[in-house]
UniProtKB/Swiss-Prot annotation:
Transmembrane segments: 59-79, 84-101, 117-137
Domain of life: Bacteria
List of catalytic residues: D111, D125
Cleavable signal peptide: none
Protein name listed in UniProt: Lipoprotein signal peptidase
InterPro entries: Peptidase_A8
EC number: 3.4.23.36
Swiss-Prot/TrEMBL catalytic activity: Release of signal peptides from bacterial membrane prolipoproteins. Hydrolyzes -Xaa-Yaa-Zaa-|-(S,diacylglyceryl)Cys-, in which Xaa is hydrophobic (preferably Leu), and Yaa (Ala or Ser) and Zaa (Gly or Ala) have small, neutral side chains
Family according to the record: Belongs to the peptidase A8 family.
Keywords: Aspartyl protease, Cell membrane, Hydrolase, Membrane, Protease, Transmembrane, Transmembrane helix
Membrane topology of this protein: Multi-pass membrane protein
Classification via Pfam families: Peptidase_A8 (PF01252)
GO terms (BP aspect): proteolysis
């Protein structure tokens, strides 16, 4: 799947999921989905992961724009035979843009996935984390074992 199409798909799914939560839940409302293990809990996150740096929206917007530019530049210079690296960048870009839109529209990020033992997060956060994991995995592999197309 082309890089920008995947990033846009991640962005669209993220924004649709947040729209569904915003229109069907009140802030701080929680719905058990799988017993006491998994809930849908609508929260406003004005900070970063774990609520760090709350209410620093301008900082987050600036950093996110810079990260998006770096991702696009990295993609431009990435060899075409590195599909897993391309996947990682698309996931990170789509997730970063999803949270950026929230910050620009609302001044906070909409979070709703609640595992009860971890801070509440969203699909954009998941895309970013999976993208970073794939990126690290690919960069740490010996050159001959990296996910290159034959």
């Amino acid at each position: 799947m082309p890089f920008l199409l995947l990033a846009l798909l991640v962005l669209a799914i993220d924004q649709l999921s947040k729209y569904m939560i915003r229109t069907n839940f009140q802030p701080n409302e929680s719905l058990p989905v799988i017993g006491s293990f998994f809930h849908l809990t609508y929260v406003h996150n004005p900070g970063a992961a774990f609520g760090l740096l709350a209410n620093k929206t301008q900082v987050f917007v600036g950093v996110t724009v810079l990260v998006a530019i770096i991702i696009l530049a990295a993609y431009r210079y990435l060899p075409p035979d590195r599909p897993l690296l391309r996947l990682s960048l698309a996931l990170m870009l789509g997730g970063a843009l999803g949270n950026l839109i929230d910050r620009l529209r609302f001044g906070y990020v909409v979070d709703f996935l609640d595992l009860r033992i971890w801070p509440v997060f969203n699909l954009a956060d998941m895309a970013i984390v999976f993208g970073v994991i794939i990126l690290c995995w690919q960069l740490l592999l010996p050159a001959g074992e990296q996910g290159r197309e034959p």
